[in-house]
C-alpha cells in the first residue's frame, strides 16, 4: 500500500520583533520593552497584537543573550512564538530572526516598543502587496512644520513637508529579499536605521501605507504616559479598530 506524504504548509506571514535592546534613553533601570503599561509589559501588548492576528503564522522575537525577563511573560510559551538571540544593533537582531524564518514567507518587522498596534493597520499592510509587490511600510504623513538646524541649534531653513512621512512599523518585505539586502548592506558598512533603508540601499523602493497616529514608539519617559492613554482607549475597543 502506498502512502501519501504531505508537506507542511510554509507560513505566508511571519512577524519579527527585535527585542534585544536595553533602552538607554528611557533611563528606567530595565529594558524599556519590559516596563509596565497598564496590566502588562510593553512587549506583552506588542506580542498580543501580533500573536492574535489570524494571518500571522509565526512570531519570532530576537532577545538579548542575557535576557532573564522574557520567560516571565504570559506570551512566552505561545505555540506561534519562537525566540532567537539578537545582536548589538537592531539590524543584527532582525538578521538573526530572518535567518530562521521560512524563506518563501513575508516578514512583518515590528518594534518591540510599539505596543498600540491594531489589526486594522496590520490588515492594510498585508493587503498592500497588490499595489506594492516590492514591499511596504506603515507610515504617517508629517503634520507639523519641519525645520532644519545648523550645528549650533539655530534654524537653517524650513523643510517642505508635502512629501515627508514618519516611518512606522511594521515594515513588510519578502523574507529572502530582506535577508539578502540587509546582510549585504551591513557587510558594506551601511548604517541601517530600519528595514526600508536596507531595501532602498539595494535599489528597492518600498511603498508607504498610511497608518494610525497612535502607533507610537516608546522611546522617552513622556512616551510611556502617552502610550498608556492610547492603550486605555484601545483596550476599551477591539484590536480590529
Curated annotation (Swiss-Prot):
Reactions listed under catalytic activity: 2-C-methyl-D-erythritol 4-phosphate + CTP + H(+) = 4-CDP-2-C-methyl-D-erythritol + diphosphate
EC number from the UniProt entry: 2.7.7.60
Pathway of action: Isoprenoid biosynthesis; isopentenyl diphosphate biosynthesis via DXP pathway; isopentenyl diphosphate from 1-deoxy-D-xylulose 5-phosphate: step 2/6
GO molecular function: 2-C-methyl-D-erythritol 4-phosphate cytidylyltransferase activity
Site (Transition state stabilizer): 25, 32
Family matches, as InterPro entries: IspD, IspD/TarI, IspD/TarI_cytidylyltransf_bact, Nucleotide-diphossugar_trans
One Pfam assignment: IspD
Gene Ontology biological process: isopentenyl diphosphate biosynthetic process, methylerythritol 4-phosphate pathway
UniProtKB keywords: Isoprene biosynthesis, Nucleotidyltransferase, Transferase
Enzyme superclass (EC): transferase
CDD domains in the record: CDP-ME_synthetase (cd02516)
SUPFAM superfamilies xrefs: Nucleotide-diphospho-sugar transferases (SSF53448)
Record keyword ATP-binding present: no
UniProt-annotated site: Positions MEP for the nucleophilic attack, residues: 161, 217
Nucleotide-binding among keywords: no
Function: Catalyzes the formation of 4-diphosphocytidyl-2-C-methyl-D-erythritol from CTP and 2-C-methyl-D-erythritol 4-phosphate (MEP).
Family that this chain belongs to: Belongs to the IspD/TarI cytidylyltransferase family. IspD subfamily.
Protein name (Swiss-Prot/TrEMBL): 2-C-methyl-D-erythritol 4-phosphate cytidylyltransferase
Taxonomy of the source species: Bacteria, Pseudomonadati, Pseudomonadota, Gammaproteobacteria, Alteromonadales
Gene designation: ispD
Amino acid at each position: 500500500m502506498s502512502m501519501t506524504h504531505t508537506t507542511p504548509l510554509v507560513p505566508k506571514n511571519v512577524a519579527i520583533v527585535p527585542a534585544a535592546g536595553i533602552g538607554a534613553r528611557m533611563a528606567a533601570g530595565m529594558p524599556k520593552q519590559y516596563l509596565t503599561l497598564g496590566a502588562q509589559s510593553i512587549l506583552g501588548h506588542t506580542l498580543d497584537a501580533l500573536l492574535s492576528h489570524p494571518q500571522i503564522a509565526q512570531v519570532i522575537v530576537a532577545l538579548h543573550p542575557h535576557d532573564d525577563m522574557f520567560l516571565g511573560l504570559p506570551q512566552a510559551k505561545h505555540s506561534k512564538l519562537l525566540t532567537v538571540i539578537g545582536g548589538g544593533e537592531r539590524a543584527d537582531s532582525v538578521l538573526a530572526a530572518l535567518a530562521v524564518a521560512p524563506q518563501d514567507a513575508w516578514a512583518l518587522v515590528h518594534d518591540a516598543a510599539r505596543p498600540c498596534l491594531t489589526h486594522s493597520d496590520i490588515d492594510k499592510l498585508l493587503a498592500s502587496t497588490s499595489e506594492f509587490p516590492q514591499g511596504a511600510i506603515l507610515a504617517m504623513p508629517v503634520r507639523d512644520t519641519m525645520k532644519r538646524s545648523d550645528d549650533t541649534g539655530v534654524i537653517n531653513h524650513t523643510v517642505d513637508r508635502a512629501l515627508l512621512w514618519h516611518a512606522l512599523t511594521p515594515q513588510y518585505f519578502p523574507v529572502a529579499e530582506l535577508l539578502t539586502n540587509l546582510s549585504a548592506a551591513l557587510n558594506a558598512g551601511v548604517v541601517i536605521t530600519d528595514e526600508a533603508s536596507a531595501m532602498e540601499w539595494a535599489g528597492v523602493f518600498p511603498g508607504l501605507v498610511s497608518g494610525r497616529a497612535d502607533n507610537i514608539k516608546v522611546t522617552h519617559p513622556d512616551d510611556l504616559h502617552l502610550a498608556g492613554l492610547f492603550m486605555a482607549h484601545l483596550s476599551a475597543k477591539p484590536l480590529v479598530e
